[in-house]
A protein has these predicted regions:
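Multi-pass membrane catalytic core of lipid/isoprenoid biosynthesis enzymes
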Residues: 9-11, 28-81
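Small-residue-rich segments of transmembrane alpha-helices in multi-pass membrane proteins
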Residues: 41-42, 104-121
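Membrane-interface helix caps and helix-loop-helix hairpins in membrane proteins
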Residues: 70-72, 92-101
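Membrane-embedded alpha-helical segments that form the functional core of polytopic membrane enzymes
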Residues: 1-26, 61, 76-89, 134-160
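C-terminal membrane-associated helical module and adjoining short loops/tails
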Residues: 55-58, 93, 111-114, 124-170
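A cytosolic-side transmembrane-helix exit/cap motif
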Residues: 26-31, 99-106, 122-131, 163-167
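Hydrophobic residues within the alpha-helical transmembrane core of Major Facilitator Superfamily
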Residues: 89-90, 116
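Acidic (Asp/Glu-rich) catalytic motifs at the cytosolic membrane interface
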Residues: 11-41, 45-49, 153-170
Length: 170
């Protein structure tokens, strides 16, 4: 339904925004070296304010995910946005300094975010007619290809970004 799709998009946007905020919190010192002109936390808002904003984004993202689970009657698929939220938090806190692992986690999260609408679309169908199965197969293939493209392009982008930011990471 349109309402379920809206909540899926809203949950995704809120969780992604939370991921950016928590990453910027952990990157205050690195950003001061690599991108001082773009630094917001520590210059325009305090670390405490940023952390409170992060918590608000996460709570709203979780609430949207719970509404999504209720609307779709699909708790398993609704766990994916929550899993992505945890991955983004662990990345910012622990894995971002691990060259390959951190890059892989961000790319995996991006790939799943792109794949999420496909999973909801084909996961909610119960019609097993030949035409419906063919349509679902086409949607699944397109979603998987798009998700893989998002994963690979993000992974390569993260590797390049790490090479550019090496001065602030030392």
């Amino acid at each position: 339904s349109t309402i379920a799709y809206l909540f899926m998009v809203l949950a995704t946007v809120l969780i992604a925004a939370g991921g950016y905020v928590v990453n910027d919190i952990y990157d205050i010192e690195i950003d001061a070296v690599n991108r001082p002109e773009k630094q917001i936390i520590g210059k325009h808002i305090s670390e405490t304010e940023a952390y409170n904003f992060y918590k608000i984004l996460c709570v709203l993202g979780v609430l949207c995910t719970l509404v999504l689970a209720f609307l779709t009657h699909n708790l398993r698929l609704s766990m994916l946005p929550l899993t992505i939220m945890l991955i983004l938090n662990f990345y910012a806190h622990t894995f971002k300094k691990q060259f390959f692992v951190g890059n892989f986690m961000i790319a995996l999260s991006t790939g799943f975010v792109v794949l999420l609408p496909t999973l909801f679309e084909i996961g909610g169908k119960v019609d097993d007619s030949d035409m419906q199965l063919e349509i679902q197969s086409g949607i699944a293939i397109a979603g998987i290809v798009y998700g893989l493209f998002a994963f690979l392009s993000t992974f390569l982008r993260e590797l390049v970004k790490d090479m550019e930011d090496v001065n602030g990471d030392i």
